[in-house]
């Protein structure tokens, strides 16, 4: 393999495959192509999640594969044919078989949106907010057979603002920082300077997927806990309660600690831009709501649609 001379070190071109999906996978691929990295293949899902990567790979003359599952036999065959030296996981929701990890000669690296070993698992951003963390970040780590357990290559921190949601934290910070971090990680590997720092398992946390099993609002809880749950579930899956046998999801939350003599879940006010709901230790203010599988709507439209009035209570059927 040809070596490219640089003033202070030798940089070896690396054959790279990228496994990913969505805007993040596409942006990582785009960033590496702009740096003229030797991307020899991409793998993305066959549905719309993989369209962006597929289109960019096709435009760039790169082999692209769209398997149903990464454990499909043809994926391993493609890996072997491509002879990658490095595999990059850029937003992967499928399980990567251990067999694939043995193919790239330098290994496989993965982006994870938390400061590992804290918040291992598929919905780390949600849980950082739900748990009330004030700082988080992202980790790029060397993949092993565990779930987010491999040695750390690179970490960057970011502050969680008091009004951040999962959406704002990801799109305004962790997404762009993660793309830059992947580029930096590849450069470190090329220079032979990429560390492999073992994770401290004694500090590890692992949470289940943030879905409707954990997204139900309990208005009996302290105001901060309710506030963090709604922020952490915004935009997905949407923290919810019930009203007249309908599932109501909350977005655009604010909190106002105070002493208030109202029942938990009681509607305090309905205004053009907000609904205020009593909780333990104050009121929370909701800017957008969604009924069952409908669209997000404003407070007044919502109240009319379900015949909600001041004094009614959420969470009572």
Can you say where each PLM-predicted feature lies in the sequence?
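One-carbon transfer enzymes
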Residues: 3-237, 269, 282-285, 291, ...
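C-terminal active-site/capping subdomain that shapes the small-molecule cofactor and substrate pocket
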Residues: 227-317
């Amino acid at each position: 393999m040809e070596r490219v001379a640089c003033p202070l070190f030798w940089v070896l071109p690396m054959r790279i495959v990228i496994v990913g999906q969505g805007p993040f996978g596409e942006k990582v691929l785009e960033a590496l192509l702009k740096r003229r990295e030797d991307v020899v293949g991409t793998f993305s899902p066959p549905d719309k999640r993989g369209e962006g990567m597929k289109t960019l790979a096709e435009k760039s003359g790169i082999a692209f594969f769209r398997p149903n599952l990464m454990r499909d036999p043809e994926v391993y065959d493609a890996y072997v044919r491509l002879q990658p030296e490095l595999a990059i996981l850029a937003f992967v929701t499928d399980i990567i078989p251990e067999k694939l990890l043995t193919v790239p000669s330098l290994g496989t690296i993965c982006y994870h949106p938390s400061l590992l070993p804290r918040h291992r698992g598929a919905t780390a951003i949600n849980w950082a907010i739900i748990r009330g963390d004030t700082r988080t970040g992202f980790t790029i780590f060397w993949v092993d057979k565990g779930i987010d357990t491999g040695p750390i290559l690179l970490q960057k921190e970011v502050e969680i603002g008091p009004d951040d949601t999962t959406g704002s934290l990801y799109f305004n910070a962790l997404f762009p920082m993660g793309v830059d971090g992947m580029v930096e990680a590849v450069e470190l590997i090329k220079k032979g300077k990429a560390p492999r720092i073992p994770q401290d398992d004694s500090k590890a946390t692992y949470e289940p997927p943030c879905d409707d099993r954990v997204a139900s609002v309990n208005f009996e809880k302290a105001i901060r806990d309710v506030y963090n749950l709604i922020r952490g579930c915004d935009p997905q899956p949407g923290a919810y309660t019930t009203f007249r046998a309908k599932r109501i999801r909350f977005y655009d939350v604010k909190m106002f600690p105070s002493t208030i003599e109202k029942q938990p879940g009681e509607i305090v006010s309905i205004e053009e831009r907000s609904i205020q709901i009593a909780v333990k230790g104050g009121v929370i203010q909701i800017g957008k709501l969604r009924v069952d599988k409908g669209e997000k709507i404003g407070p007044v439209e919502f109240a009319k649609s379900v015949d909600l009035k001041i004094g009614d209570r959420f969470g009572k059927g």
